[in-house]
Structures are given as structure tokens and as C-alpha cells.
Regions:
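N-terminal Rossmann-like dinucleotide-binding module
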Residues: 1-55
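C-terminal glycine/acidic-rich active-site capping loop/insertion
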Residues: 257, 282, 288-364, 393
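C-terminal helix-rich "cap/oligomerization" subdomain common to oxidoreductases
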Residues: 1-5, 78-80, 337-340, 344-393
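Beta-loop-alpha module in the N-terminal Rossmann-like domain of NAD(P)-dependent dehydrogenases
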Residues: 56-121
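Rossmann-fold dehydrogenase core element
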Residues: 117-135, 155-158
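Hydrophobic residues in well-ordered beta-strands that form the structural core
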Residues: 104, 129-131, 293
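Intrinsic disorder/low-complexity segments
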Residues: 242-261
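Predominantly a Rossmann-like dinucleotide-binding segment in NAD(P)-dependent oxidoreductases
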Residues: 4, 15, 136-229, 301, ...
Length: 393
């Protein structure tokens, strides 16, 4: 049976940007959609050149995203938003109001109120809204989720997640910055947070995704260590986890958490972790076993037991299909052929596009995850400003 190829447009993501090309590669991974239009940059020359490099019809390369949505809404299947933070909400809102499904970079907005409004519009118009919390797309993260769900770890007591980078150790914020870094330090563009809104939301979403639990309260200590930096570049956050509400569980494809009433989480996110590159390391401790996953060795998942040898699960090994349908479906290449970040985002796009076609719930971060992540950011900022007091999420 011939499968219809979808058509999409992109706002932001000019040639030379970091995340735009990754989105395009991820979408091409399963060859389900074609880029047919775009508004790639505020810079007119960069916008035109990007369209040319991507072999687009010049008449479908727009100087303004509002013009793009007005002219293309009836011809597109979905819109991808890869712009700076302050424009996520207005672009996503306009696209949803025009009847377009949307895949929007994180953070979904600058405030909880904005994120909730996007959620209401998507629900009212029955549209699909996806967010690239990419680490939830890794096969072994899906295996971790399913092992927890099946009770392999027992009652979950403790979760430790660190997401550490050393990138800000290379930057002097007292001097003029290149475009890629300058906007992240401007509150009018990035919003009121840097590290929490940039990579902290990834860590938060991973914890809720893997455990199936919901963070109820947090205590945050935010710091700015890099000279000249106006926003947070380091965060230490404690969280208390519990079963999600029924409505939240339904929005997470019916996933219920591991049996736990008092689970605690410790989250460390930093951009001043000297020597680190992109260290995402997850540990989940239950009363029967624990697990460990490292994003820099993403094809392996370790499980430790009190009285048995440690087990290392390998992506695409023959036994994976029996343990986790999600991990099996997310594995693309034979065992021993490593998969990474682009493939993980490709998995999320595969599920997002399936939802666009079927109008059914699929396994990707959607409206619920986007709103939850913004509640996390606002709670962390509120806690830090109040002297690191426990704050409701």
C-alpha cells in the first residue's frame, strides 16, 4: 500500500544553526515527510541561502513566519518551530489557530500560562503538539521505563539524574558573544532561566517518563558561576515524587508509575561542569534492583541486584523484544551498530507523524510534557528566589 508522504514547513533552523539541521535529518530518518516551505532566519540573506541550499521553491521561502502560516496552512501537514525561546509561543499559537499540527522546540513557552493556553488550543482543535525531549526517544531509555513499569526494580525509592556540560567554561560573557550564545544570556529572548529551561527540562522529563511518577514539589538552588553571566548556569534540585493524577496518566498513554509513595529525586544540571561534554546519566534505585543509563554510551543499560550479578542489556539484542516493545521498535540498526541523538529524535518524529496521520495517542512528548516542564521551570525559579524553599510544581 502506498503511504502518503507528509509535507511540512520549518520556522528557524537556518543552515549553520545547531538544531535545525538535526530536526531535518531526524525527519528524513523514516522518509515520511518532505520539507516544502520555510522561514529560516531573520537575516534576509541567510533565509534565502538556506532555502536555496535545501532546494526549496523560492516562492515558498518567506521573510516572515506570519506570512508563511497565512500562505501555507492549507497546504501543510505540520509545522516545525526551531526558533529562539521568546518566539515559540506566538508561532505555535498562530499555527495551531490556523489548524496546523506543530512540533515545537523546548521550552514550549516562557511561562506556564502560555504553555497551558497552547494546550487548550490543541485540545479544542484536536491538533497534535510535540516537543523534542530527545532523550525519551533512546531505545534503552524506553527499556528502562518498561523495566520499572513491570516491577523489575520493585518499589522506587530514589532517582538521581545529572545533565552536565562544560560549555560555559569556554565563554567570557563580559565580551561580545557570537549569535549562538548571545541570545541564551538575554532574558528577553531566552526567558528568565538558562540552564533549567535549556537542559533541566530534559532531565525533569526523563525522570517522569522513566519512573511514570509525577514530581509534586521541589527545592532548588540555582547559581551563576560564569563571569558576566546574568542567568543560571548551574542548578541542584531535590524533588518529591508520587503517583500521577488520573488525568495526567491518561495523557501519558495510560502509563502508571512504579509502586511508590515516598520516592525522592536528585537532579543536577550544569553548563560549568569543567571538562564535561554532554553528560546525561540516569540512576533509578528500587528496593529490588537499580538501573543506570549513560547518554554517552547510549546503547547499553545496566541493572544491579543485591544478590545477583550485574546485568548489561544491549540495544537490539535478541531478548529486547520480549522485554520492551518500545525499545525494540525504536532500534533501527543491528546490534553493534551504534545509534545516538539523531536516531532518538527520529524515533520521536516517527511517533509524532504517526499521531498526525492516525489522530491517536502515541509514544512521544506532547502537550502534557510541555506544560509539566514549564511548571518545573517556574517552580525552580520560585524556590531559588525564596531561599531554596520547598515549592509546589
Amino acid at each position: 500500500m502506498k503511504v502518503k508522504r507528509l509535507q511540512y514547513a520549518m520556522v528557524g533552523g537556518a543552515k549553520g544553526s545547531f538544531i535545525g539541521p538535526i530536526h531535518r535529518m531526524a525527519i528524513r530518518m523514516d522518509d515520511l515527510a518532505d520539507l516544502v516551505a520555510g522561514c529560516f532566519s531573520r537575516d534576509p540573506k541567510a533565509n534565502v541561502v538556506s532555502g536555496e541550499k535545501l532546494s526549496l521553491d523560492p516562492t515558498r521561502v518567506y521573510s516572515d513566519w506570519k506570512k508563511l502560516i497565512a500562505a501555507e496552512a492549507d497546504r501543510l501537514d505540520f509545522l516545525v518551530v526551531c526558533t529562539t525561546n521568546e518566539t515559540h509561543y506566538p508561532i505555535a499559537k498562530a499555527a495551531l489557530e490556523a489548524g496546523l499540527d506543530v512540533f515545537c522546540e523546548k521550552p514550549l513557552s516562557l511561562t506556564v500560562k502560555e504553555a497551558e493556553e497552547l494546550g487548550r488550543i490543541a485540545k479544542r482543535k484536536r491538533l497534535v503538539l510535540g516537543i523534542p525531549f530527545t532523550y525519551t526517544g533512546y531505545p534503552m531509555v524506553k527499556l528502562a521505563r518498561d523495566l520499572v513499569k513491570k516491577g523489575e526494580l520493585g518499589k522506587i525509592d530514589k532517582v538521581v539524574l545529572e545533565y552536565v556540560q562544560g560549555s560555559f567554561r569556554k565563554i567570557d560573557f563580559t565580551k561580545p558573544l557570537d549569535k549562538r550564545n548571545a541570545w541564551k544570556m538575554n532574558p528577553k529572548v531566552s526567558g528568565p532561566s538558562c540552564v533549567v529551561a535549556d537542559i533541566g527540562v530534559h532531565a525533569f522529563t526523563m525522570i517522569e517518563y522513566v519512573t511514570g511518577l509525577e514530581a509534586k514539589t521541589l527545592l532548588a538552588d540555582l547559581s551563576s558561576f560564569a563571569p558576566g553571566n546574568r542567568l543560571d548556569d548551574d542548578a541542584s534540585i531535590l524533588m518529591r515524587l508520587a503517583e500521577p493524577s488520573r488525568s495526567e496518566a491518561r495523557e501519558r498513554s495510560g502509563t502508571r508509575g512504579a509502586t511508590s509513595s515516598t520516592a525522592k529525586a536528585s537532579l543536577v544540571v550544569s553548563k560549568i561542569a569543567t571538562g564535561e561534554e554532554n553528560g546525561v546519566r540516569l540512576r533509578v534505585y528500587g528496593d529490588k534492583a537499580s538501573l543506570f543509563w549513560d547518554q554517552e554510551s547510549p546503547n547499553y543499560l545496566s541493572v544491579k541486584y543485591p544478590l545477583k550479578p550485574e546485568m548489561t542489556f544491549k540495544r537490539k539484542a535478541p531478548y529486547i523484544a520480549d522485554l520492551s516493545d518500545g525499545a525494540q521498535r525504536a532500534s533501527r540498526f543491528p546490534a553493534g551498530h551504534h545509534e545516538g541523538f539523531v536516531e532518538a529524535l527520529g524515533n520521536i518524529y516517527d511517533e509524532f507523524i504517526a499521531a498526525v496521520v492516525s489522530r491517536k495517542t502515541r509514544d512521544f512528548p506532547g502537550v502534557c510534557a510541555g506544560i509539566r516542564s514549564m511548571r518545573f521551570v517556574e517552580a525552580a525559579l520560585k524556590s531559588a528566589k525564596s531561599g531554596s524553599r520547598w515549592t509546589k510544581i
